[in-house]
Every structure is written in C-alpha cells, then in structure tokens.
Amino acid sequence: MVAVRFYAVEMSLPCLCPCPSSPISLSLCSPRFNLLNTTSRRLGLSRNCRTLRISCSSSSTVTDQTQQSSFNDAELKLIDALIGIQGRGKSASPKQLNDVESAVKVLEGLEGIQNPTDSDLIEGRWRLMFTTRPGTASPIQRTFTGVDVFTVFQDVYLKATNDPRVSNIVKFSDFIGELKVEAVASIKDGKRVLFRFDRAAFDLKFLPFKVPYPVPFRLLGDEAKGWLDTTYLSPSGNLRISRGNKGTTFVLQKETVPRQKLLATISQDKGVAEAIDEFLASNSNSAEDNYELLEGSWQMIWSSQMYTDSWIENAANGLMGRQIIEKDGRIKFEVNIIPAFRFSMKGKFIKSESSTYDLKMDDAAIIGGAFGYPVDITNNIELKILYTDEKMRISRGFDNIIFVHIREI
C-alpha cells in the first residue's frame, strides 16, 4: 500500500510619453533563468550562477554613502517601496502598488524644486524605475518594456540648446545597442513640457550606421503629440516624478541607492559576486551584525550554486524556488515544477549563534492539487545571514553557496 498524505493547499513599459503604435514589432527573447560563470572572491570558487531577472536600476558612479545622502526620508520611502518590484510596475501586487502610490502622493505634497522645467536639475539622462499604469503603453512600447532585460531611459535637454528635445531610449544591451525615439520639446510653464515626436532610429553596435525606425510621425497628427508634467523634482536632482497626458505616473532616477545597484547587477548577469562583496563591505558593522531570519516568503533571485543532475536534490538544498519562514521556527522550501505541481520540503530552524541558523528539513513531498506524495529525503543545513532588511536578504547556505532572496508581498 502506498502512503499518501493530504495537504490543505492554497492555490494560488512603457515609454515615458505617449508614442504611436508601429507596424513593426520587435521581439527579443531570453530565458527566465540564466546560467552564467562568475568568480566569487568571497568563496574562492568558480560556479554557475542562477538568476531570476528583476527590474531595477543603477547608473551612478558615486560612492554608496554619497548616494544614500542624496535622498531625503520621503524619497527613500518611495525607493524602498520600489525594491523587488518586477517589470517596472507591470507585475506589482496590489499592496506594492498602494505603497508606491502612497509614497508618490507624499512627495508630490512636499516642496521639491519650484518650477522644475526652469531648473537645470531636470536636464540629463533619467532612468525609468516604475510606471503606475503600464497597460496604457502602445504595443511597440510593451514589446520593449515587457522584457526585464531592457533598460528604459529618458533624455531631457530643454535649455542651452537651439533644439530642445525629450528623447526616450530603450537600451537592449551594451553589445546590441538601443532604439531612440526623439521629440521636439517646448516649455509651457513651470511644470509642463509639450512635445511632438518627429524621428526615431536604431543605433546597433554591429552596424556602422543608424537604422531609421519606420514610423510616419508627420502623418500621425495629434497622435504624435503630448505633454509631460513634472510633479516632483528632488532638491538633489536625483529623483523625479512625472505624469503624462494619458494619466500615467512615472518614477525616474539619476542616482540609485546600494540595494538598487546590486539588484541591477544581478539583472544584468555581470560581476554579481563582486557586486555582492562590495555591497556587504559597505554595509558591514561587526559590532552590530546580528541578523534575524525574518518571516515571510522569500524568492531566490540569484545563487552562486553549482547545479547537480537532480533537480530534486537542488530543491532540497534550497538552491531554487522560494523559502517560507514562519515566526514559530518553521521553514519551507517550495519549488514550482510544472503547472499545478510543486515540490515542498518542510523543516525547523533554530538560531545557533550570531546571524547563524541550523535548519533541519525532513518533510518533503510532491504536491499536486490537494494531494501530497511523500519523498524520502532529509537535509541539515547551516544558514548564515550576511545581510538582511525588510526587502532583501543575502545568505550563505548549503556547500557555502551565496544566495540573494527578495521578500515577496
């Protein structure tokens, strides 16, 4: 007779201005998980790394301390609300959307730079972090911003030029190139910029010339026009909130905080181990480092792991999926296998020393629907918390593997 256990199971971008649809569609596909080779100075090992793409950004070269001081408390609250949101808002949960919108309203009610369109601080390149209504984008915009690997910028140059412009840039990668859609711009008042799209082109690294983007802007009339209000510009000039004529709200940044910089590196699949070392060094305070294993659902987005031939072994070692931490000392590893089926492994944890926990995992099963099929596997793991906050955790676990988890809301 086969023993069967029963479980109660809970089933569970836009361009920055309105741009007309195009008869051309562009599709760049990439797998959700990627293997890459990177060298971890912390571990002294060469490993294959597993990455879940997330939306984040970093373009600053200043130090982390300077970045941190560039934002006031209300701005940091908005930035904190953005941490872990995928697709620049496209995949945000209702709570995440509410947190971001609340933080946006607080900033819009504060006194930022008066008449931002007259300020030199609005000039330069801005990176799109979040949009509250990504569904209002045109089909070609959704093709670009719906894939996390793309980075979206906005260049604003209104003063000290005979050709004021607002340009939207979709950067595919450093090796492929970008698409730039340009608009003639004019200042209407202290907050509003009027624009009219008039040209666009692909700038591809492997071609010695630009490829025109075939959209007949002149024939589109009012569809190629719009306006953009800046409702908040930070005194440091590093954060901007804008609202477009389609009702969309945009959050843009010039500089980023340390967590955003690390998450951007993970998203780009380059130099992750080095970025983790840099982040940990900048956040280390040995006299106070005593991190707790915070409760909640934590999705793994990166690990310095070495894959084995057995996915179930990887799952049992916490090398994939999510960890669900409960405050009564219970923990669960959970991995989605195929639709309607997942691997679940339950256990308990106790704190053995500062920032270190002993995990005993001994209740594994393949779950399909409301039924659980036992798997005879046990595991003992020492988990060292290297850094944690309310949104992100860096830890060292099975076989000295480094993990980065994002807390799910």
From Swiss-Prot:
Q: Which InterPro entries match?
A: PAP, PAP/fibrillin_dom
- What Pfam families does this protein's entry cite? PAP_fibrillin (PF04755)
Keyword Chloroplast listed? The answer is yes
- UniProt keyword tRNA processing present: no
Q: Which UniProt keywords apply?
A: Chloroplast, Plastid, Thylakoid, Transit peptide
GO CC terms on record?
Answer: chloroplast; chloroplast envelope; chloroplast thylakoid; chloroplast thylakoid membrane; nucleus
Transit peptide located at 1-55
Q: Which residues cross the membrane?
A: none
Compartmental location? Plastid, Chloroplast thylakoid
Family of this protein: Belongs to the PAP/fibrillin family.
Write the protein's name. Answer: Probable plastid-lipid-associated protein 12, chloroplastic
Organism for this UniProt entry = Arabidopsis thaliana
Biological classification of the source: Eukaryota, Viridiplantae, Streptophyta, Embryophyta, Tracheophyta
